[in-house]
Swiss-Prot record:
Keywords: ATP-binding, Cell cycle, Cell division, Cell shape, Cell wall biogenesis/degradation, Cytoplasm, Ligase, Magnesium, Nucleotide-binding, Peptidoglycan synthesis. Meso-2,6-diaminopimelate binds at R322, D346, N347, P348, R349, G397, E401. A motif (Meso-diaminopimelate recognition motif) lies at residues 346-349. Transmembrane segments: none annotated. Carboxylation is probably crucial for Mg(2+) binding and, consequently, for the gamma-phosphate positioning of ATP. This is UDP-N-acetylmuramoyl-L-alanyl-D-glutamate--2,6-diaminopimelate ligase. Pfam families: Mur_ligase_C, Mur_ligase_M. It catalyses: UDP-N-acetyl-alpha-D-muramoyl-L-alanyl-D-glutamate + meso-2,6-diaminopimelate + ATP = UDP-N-acetyl-alpha-D-muramoyl-L-alanyl-gamma-D-glutamyl-meso-2,6-diaminopimelate + ADP + phosphate + H(+). InterPro entries: Folylpolyglutamate_synth_CS, Mur-like_cat_sf, Mur_ligase_C, Mur_ligase_C_dom_sf, Mur_ligase_cen, UDP-N-AcMur-Glu-dNH2Pim_ligase. The gene is murE. Its cofactor is Mg(2+). Its EC number is 6.3.2.13. GO terms for cellular component: cytoplasm.
Length: 427
């Protein structure tokens, strides 16, 4: 990509290099150093790039990493800070936003560094105080956050995912740990699988285990209602969000904001209660129909456990060209919670959907009770036809995604749109 300057431009791609342009050298493209020089480009690093783009180094960057909860936690911090009167930027799975305005569409969880610097340039122009970003394990291994100075770092949790990229769970865990070796402010989930971290400037949070930010009592009956203690402070979290996993997300979001800006606790409580959640995360898209992005065994278990008081009809699949070992585990978990399970297609990419579906099916013990419907629209239609008054249809895997990737082509597809179309046709 190119970023324009007054009389030149910055690029991270040697194919775009010209005489007198600037080539941003990163860990990923360093091997093309000689090619950039041959074309007459000036080699710069991230710090030099920030100066050329006149990025305000006073902007406080908050990074969130973990298997699940990154998107909701990032959105919660963004919303709370905006409600407290601060100017903020946000980038992650849902796209990029500055001061409540979307400036870029959905992309990678963590963008290439030059794209992130472009967002920070806009954040500077819009006089932002904070910039919140999701940080994936891929980005940590590929050093896509090099040169960024984080004011705060958050660890949500770690469970099996991305073994197609990391090879082993230990490699995946080590990738997450890379983020927490320095002395910056950090927030660590004490109830999650333990990771190594630098204890300097570390704040812990938890429900089950002793932590600096501790939940003392909570109710999840209608939304979330809880009391949080921290040293000599006590404040409430009251939220319409559902589930224990969202309690953790709101706990760390409030802890992070509390440490960074020291707000009046009544203002903090009001800002927390004003956060309505994220599209595609336990989102009720029609009466008795929930759509959620959960696509890992742990994520699926947390969502279904939250909804277990209802009779569940679960529509789900698994993405192609990704960790295959999690597929039977996903099936096993859905079987435990679902009245009816419908296995379908979910971004099969280069793989055959039927193969993925069979691998999910292998996790079921009572296979005769499972419906296999490859066409995702037909699978959703079947679930809605089978739904009785007290049932809850739960459609997992895509959340608010608007495409379905098959053989390298992204076709328009939205679970939410499909549900509403089917219900409209049913009258």
């Amino acid at each position: 990509m190119k970023l324009k300057l007054e009389n030149s431009f910055i690029t991270d791609n040697t194919l775009e290099c010209e005489k007198e342009c600037f080539f941003l050298q990163t860990t990923q493209n360093a091997k093309f150093h000689a090619q950039a020089l041959e074309k007459g480009a000036k080699i710069i690093d991230v710090n030099e790039c920030k100066k050329l783009l006149k990025i305000d180094e006073k902007i406080q960057i908050i990074g969130i990493t973990g298997t699940n909860g990154k998107t909701t936690t990032a959105a919660a911090i963004y919303s709370i800070l905006l409600d407290l009167g601060y100017k903020c930027g946000l980038c992650g799975t849902r796209g990029a936003f500055i001061n409540d305005e979307q400036i870029d569409e959905k992309s990678l969880t963590t963008s290439p560094i030059l794209k992130t610097l472009e967002y920070l340039q806009i954040a500077t122009q819009k006089k932002c105080d904070f910039f919140i970003m999701e940080v994936s394990s891929h980005a940590l291994v590929q050093n896509r956050i090099e040169g960024l100075n984080f004011a705060a770092k958050i660890f949500t949790n770690i469970t099996q995912d991305h073994l197609d990229f990391h090879g082993t769970f230990e490699n995946y865990k080590e990738a997450k740990e890379l983020f927490f070796t320095d002395e910056s402010l950090k927030f660590i989930n004490k109830d999650a699988l333990a990771i190594k971290f630098n204890v300097r400037n570390a704040f812990t949070y938890g429900i089950e285990n002793p932590a600096l930010y501790q939940i003392k009592a909570y109710s999840l009956e209608e939304g979330i209602s809880t009391i949080v203690t921290n040293k000599n402070q006590t404040f409430h979290i009251d939220s319409p969000l559902l589930g224990l996993f969202n309690l953790y997300n709101l706990l760390v979001a409030s802890a992070c904001v509390n440490e960074l800006v020291k707000p009046d606790l009544k203002d903090l409580e009001k800002a927390i209660s004003g956060f309505g959640g994220v599209c595609g995360r336990v989102e009720q898209v029609a009466k008795g129909v929930i759509v959620d992005f959960a696509h890992t065994p742990d994520g699926i278990e947390k969502v279904l456990d939250t909804l277990k008081n209802k009779k569940l009809i679960v529509v789900f699949g698994a993405g192609g060209d990704r960790d295959k070992t999690k597929r039977p585990l996903m099936g096993k978990i859905v079987e435990h919670f679902a009245k009816i399970a419908i296995i379908t297609s979910d971004n099969p990419r280069s793989e055959e959907p039927k193969t993925i579906m069979e691998e999910i099916l292998s996790g079921f013990t009572k296979k005769e009770k499972v419906l296999m419907i490859e066409d995702r629209k037909e699978a959703i239609k079947k679930a809605l036809e089978l739904k009785e008054n007290d049932d809850l249809v739960v459609i997992l895997g895509k959340g608010d995604e608007t495409t379905q990737e098959i053989k390298g082509i992204k076709y328009p597809f939205s679970d939410k749109v499909v549900v509403n179309e089917i219900l409209k046709n049913q009258g």
